[in-house]
């Protein structure tokens, strides 16, 4: 990975600084109701958004598909009741119904989040069909 890109991705964000200091996440920025992260707030008018993955996030779910690509190091995710460790090069795919959290990670543990509205997959559905297990998982 390009060193400049890595340094940019690895930098601790203001959001992460606040979480590390014990502050609560800014729910107005992320959630429409309860602990459900909202696509309209995070994706605005886009179908797909790529952003640095927050290294420490409490239990939540979302109304979009989340893909987490581990660019460097590793992170531990609790998905439902299952503990998953993803390592450099791994991709974690979470559907809209997944409730999960990310355990605290180090500065060198860098992941990229790819947030996708379910409507993005409409063209894919015409190819694979609606009665497939992948369709059930994604939507």
Named regions from a protein language model:
Residues 1-74, 129-137:
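Generic protein-terminus/edge-of-domain signal
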Residues 46-136:
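N-terminal regulatory/effector-sensing and dimerization cores
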């Amino acid at each position: 990975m390009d060193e400049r890109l890595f340094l940019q991705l690895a930098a601790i964000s203001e959001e992460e600084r606040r979480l590390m200091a014990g502050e609560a996440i800014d729910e107005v920025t992320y959630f429409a109701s309860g602990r459900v992260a909202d696509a309209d707030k995070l994706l605005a008018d886009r179908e797909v958004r790529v952003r640095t993955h927050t290294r420490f996030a409490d239990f939540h779910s979302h109304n979009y598909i989340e893909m987490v690509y581990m660019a460097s190091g590793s992170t531990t995710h609790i998905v439902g009741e299952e503990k998953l460790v993803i390592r450099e090069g791994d991709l974690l795919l979470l559907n809209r119904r997944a409730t999960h959290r990310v355990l605290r990670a180090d500065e060198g543990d860098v992941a990229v989040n790819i947030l996708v509205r379910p409507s993005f997959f409409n063209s894919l559905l015409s190819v694979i069909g609606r009665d497939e297990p992948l369709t059930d998982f994604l939507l």
